[in-house]
């Protein structure tokens, strides 16, 4: 699956709320395939040209989490931590970004259930990075 160019205006656009539909599962599946093709641990819908608030994080070894209309807040025990981040939209760029290392992510799953889960370390980083994409923020501007 082709990703949008790093200069595509959709990467600077706040995404529309995702309305769960029959197409949600196919979109999620396509995004997981794209993640595998690009060896990524996260992908947001705008990175494939879709203006909708849906992201996927995970890996074949850990499983994938589809997050619809996600939000996050800092967990009580969180500390700011520097992470070396990459992004499939910026394939030749890695930056050190400071982010909370423990968050509570809230999202709707493909069954329409609103859930909250704790994400730590690299998974907290990935959740925040993909949420940034859904809010029109790319890591090169942080």
Where are these regions (language model features)?
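Positively charged
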Residues: 1-142
């Amino acid at each position: 699956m082709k990703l949008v160019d790093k200069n595509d205006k959709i990467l600077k656009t706040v995404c529309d709320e995702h309305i769960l539909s029959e197409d949600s599962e196919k979109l999620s599946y396509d995004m997981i395939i794209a993640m595998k093709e690009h060896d990524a641990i996260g992908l947001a819908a705008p990175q494939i040209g879709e203006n909708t608030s849906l992201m996927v994080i995970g890996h074949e070894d850990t499983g994938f989490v589809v997050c619809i209309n996600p939000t996050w807040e800092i967990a009580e025990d969180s500390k700011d931590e520097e992470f070396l981040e990459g992004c499939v939209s910026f394939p030749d760029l890695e930056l050190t970004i400071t982010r909370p290392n423990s968050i509570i992510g809230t999202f709707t799953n493909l069954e329409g259930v609103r859930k909250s889960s704790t994400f730590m370390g690299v998974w907290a980083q990935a959740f925040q990075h993909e949420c940034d994409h859904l809010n029109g923020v790319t890591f090169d501007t942080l």
